[in-house]
Design a protein with these regions (language model features):
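Beta-strand segments within the central parallel beta-sheet cores of soluble alpha/beta enzyme folds
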Residues: 1, 61-66, 84-89, 152-163, ...
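Flexible glycine-/small-residue-enriched beta->alpha junction loops
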Residues: 1-48
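Glycine/charged-rich beta-loop-alpha catalytic/anionic-binding loops adjacent to active sites
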Residues: 24-30, 116-125, 157-164, 218-220
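Active-site pocket-shaping loop/turn-to-helix segments
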Residues: 33-41, 51-54, 58-65, 122-138, ...
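Phosphate/pyrophosphate-binding loops at sites that engage ATP/ADP/AMP, CoA/4′-phosphopantetheine
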Residues: 49-54, 147-154, 180-195, 210-216
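N-terminal extracellular/periplasmic Venus flytrap/periplasmic-binding protein-like
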Residues: 59-149, 212-219
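Short glycine/threonine-rich loop-to-helix capping motif typified by GTGT followed
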Residues: 96-101, 168-175, 200-218
């Protein structure tokens, strides 16, 4: 079982959670979201990539609006209802809960009214970037023989993967070289992929990666 947890509220002791006696106060914007090598926040590495790739605020907002609209539609149709589970906390059942970060009715126009947060030439706003939230996910990985013996029908097959290091100032560019490496190892091409996931925090970053890879946002 492979599982991952994002419990950001418990990383450090951020001021928004309230202060307690004899405890240090930490701002996780600096303790967790700042790259010490380039001295840039994660959002700023996205902005740097967007400048190099000529990605505009309008393009970032357009893709963010599409993401919000896709989320709204998936909730309406129950697309992911079978993959969202309730959890027990202190004897109480919590969830399943709809995605709590998107805003129903979001449009490119409504996003364009939001201010940027990392300087006058930044593309990042509260509407075209991921929120700082908690979450967890898990997946079961088995050999094909074990899946057959257990009577399980595989949903997917792991063919290859790629891990690539790059200039810290453009950390946001990572999906491009890592995807190319994974495809090369699999003997596949970009054109041969019918569905992509660029699981990143900033819409501008995703647009830049799609632009460099030459893929259409309709399959991302």
């Amino acid at each position: 079982v492979l599982r991952g947890t994002r419990h950001i509220n418990r990383l450090g002791r951020p001021p928004r959670n309230g202060d307690t006696l004899n405890k240090d106060m930490e701002d996780y914007l600096f303790t967790n979201l700042l790259d010490s090598i380039s001295n840039k926040f994660m959002a700023q590495t996205s902005d740097e990539l967007c400048r190099r790739m000529d990605v505009t605020r309008e393009q970032a907002d357009a893709f963010a609006a599409l993401s919000h609209q896709r989320t709204e539609e998936s909730i309406r149709t129950g697309t992911w209802s079978e993959e969202i589970v309730s959890i027990q906390v202190d004897g109480k059942t919590i969830g399943p809960k709809d995605e709590d970060h998107f805003v129903p009715g979001t449009t490119r126009q409504s996003l364009s009214n939001l201010r940027t947060h990392f300087g006058p030439d930044s593309l990042v706003t509260a509407g075209n970037a991921s929120g700082i939230v908690d979450g967890a996910a898990a997946v079961v990985v088995k050999s094909l023989d074990r899946a057959k013996s257990d009577g399980d029908e595989p949903l997917a097959r792991i063919v290859s993967w790629g891990i690539v290091g790059l200039e810290p100032a453009i950390m946001a560019y990572g999906p491009v070289p890592s995807s190319k490496l994974a495809l090369d190892r699999a003997g596949a091409s970009i054109d041969g992929v019918s569905r992509w996931e660029i699981n990143e925090a900033f819409a501008g970053q995703a647009v830049a990666c799609m632009k460099d890879l030459g893929i259409d946002q309709s399959i991302v």
